[in-house]
């Protein structure tokens, strides 16, 4: 920058600050500077202050200078203002050269700093102000947080805690992980990490104890961030646009009021169970998750909300809409369970009584469980509950027949302890497993007295829970959703005892008639439901699920196998955690001892060191359900697993037989479409049956539909008969003929299927009335460029693309002018993620693509050296190999040309860094060196010369030729251009006199030649056609020679015709002061 430019910069900046300096100094406005501007200011300051050192802190005054120097006075004013500025925004625009140091030493009072695109290694002076910053914004600059927080940018110092920083915004960066530098932000309240690439927060957010607002949206998180003590203050959590499948850990954020989980991967509403403990939650967003598409999404979500959220239902927002009270009531009518989600309470926390703990806790915390509802539940559960010989802690008074039960209690104490241990371990439905758990030969004795029915245990509902539906309602949902149903053998005896005991109770209470009617109705439903219970094939096994290849331990549960399903049943509440169909089971096996020893052991279990691990493979589409691994926790684990395998082996054998029959029908032979290699698919590797020995099921990655020769996945199944007659083969080829509705490729309008049939003749003019059998149609929008017929896509993958991993991106059917070729020819321009292809259209598009497409050119994308958008956006020039090769795409429609350019630039930006070049798109400008400059009129009143440019077709009888139409305020030109010529071709020589003198001689040489010209004053009228809306005729009349002439033109879209008429009409009507005559005819007459 010269001295004059530097002084001009100082004057302009000083003038701006003199006018608006008060709002800058008060902090109401932010001072925004480009980094080159700040560098020039620092250079000027250093000329008068000397070298600036990092040790200079505090307010600095300039040395005294003569007061008659205006530059020095402006400089001193600027220096004083910068030292008192409170808010600064630095914007860096990357240039071709290296970036020099960016010093912020003059800013001594900063409280708010924003960095956009600033290279942090060039930033100096942050160490002097970081301890006083209150707001920090850094975007498009960060690779790791420690670059800014620990090293203070280019200062490379060891920062102490940022004591004053309250808000930090690190969005739109390239962060892939967090680091320990976040612990320096001890006072932070607002943190924005959105639009990065973070996959796991680990524990780096646990030190932010004052954090109130956390935005970590649009990252790649798989787990909810761990907050630790910092979660106590968190009120707003935004996790939108991540990859969450589970909300485990969210229950720790008890004060959360705003939660955004939109656009994640939450599949079922049961994943929302942690929301049960978020009593302060008032806003929830689930839009875009798979569960959001459930027809009863709002009602299903309402059952997992905290009771306090139900109390505030009128103010609760779900997906931006107020949650109505009807949403809380709908789940009962729909059969949705209003039961609270399971909580991670340890086994053994259930109280000794079967009825559960004192309900006063639930009443005080939730405020929605009322005593009348409890009585209603008791009346429903009474018939269903087994006989338990102890008082219920939910009764106002113990109801016993013996007024002095002390002796009876001592007599029955051993049996009570045994039953209590069962209930403590297995929950309310402990009778379901009694036959498997009680000692042989010592069945539980029938107690002579009965206790009042009690409420369900707290472990099955959790605090603040709403009452469960009645058992008839629960069983009405079918055996798949009611695993608590007992088998007939186990439940027969308790039912008979219950009838007798209830009868005695009702005689004492005077309710025998009403209770008898209720019992009779419920017993009929019970007998009907028992017939639908699936028979158990073996005893339940106590197991611990292992998740993922690492074997992460889950919660202990029971594994039940029935005639049709395999259930994972919760220990305490006996709820079904997972239901898997046996018909989908493919393999069942025991992992070897070495693999089992490497698997983690659940803490607190007394299992043997050699506990077996059971692996089950299912044929589900969802990856999470394809493999189930269980650590067997039974005392006789090996015997129990063998018993289970004896049941599951016949099921897997049937699955293998069905798979073999299916492969026999397919004859098991494939052919690769890329290399022609024929091969048989590999047999599925199922554990011990594989040729390579045992292999863990979760490591299976083989796919039989991949060619072993070239790795391509484009394979077809060979026909059953190898001797197919030629007649059938021809019929098969004819069956590939496209349907009239097919749209194999997108191309600009008007080009149709007109081909360059003659070697030296130009392509025919566009005709929108004949598109051939491929029904080519223009893309209505940019996304249409990526749409391609499946037959053409297969042809590109097999015959054109040279790499097996090459992927199609977009294509455009367009005329192309290629350097070294005469004229232009129709091409299919295809862009992949590796190369750009030109496929010449050589024939009618009625046969397979190989018969009418010929590969002409393949250019690696990293070799592109120039992209230029032509005049009016009607052409696109591509250069490669430093200009050694070039071509011009001629869509002649600005919309399609710009759409293709945007797609091409997106593909170039997505290339790997090693392949990415620095090519950027430019736009052709008309300068004095331009080929059209001598034809334009110079207007002294305007800076730029006015003209209208259009690539069109000149209709000459039944044929057409390519021309360019150039309009100036006084003249109309028809030009012949060499589209593939160099952009720096010599322009037509300028001469005085008539324009005809400027016409260069024909033949090789200039890139443009004036074919014909007419003064605007000779234009008499314009002729349009209803049947051909892209055609027009300009009629001329020369008053001197009294001759009439016309130009019959054709454009590619009606928008161009409208713009052409609008540009002509204004100067013509200004010249004659009357309206331009426009005549519309019905049909196009080619003979005139």
Swiss-Prot record:
Residues 508-529 have a biased composition (Acidic residues). GO terms for biological process: protein localization. SUPFAM superfamilies: Outer arm dynein light chain 1. Residues 375-385 have a biased composition (Basic residues). PROSITE patterns: LRR. It is found in: Cytoplasm. Transmembrane segments: none annotated. Its main location: cytoplasm. Residues 733-742 have a biased composition (Polar residues). It comes from the Eukaryota. Residues 750-759 have a biased composition (Basic and acidic residues). Belongs to the STK11IP family. This is Serine/threonine-protein kinase 11-interacting protein. It comes from Homo sapiens (Human). The gene is STK11IP.
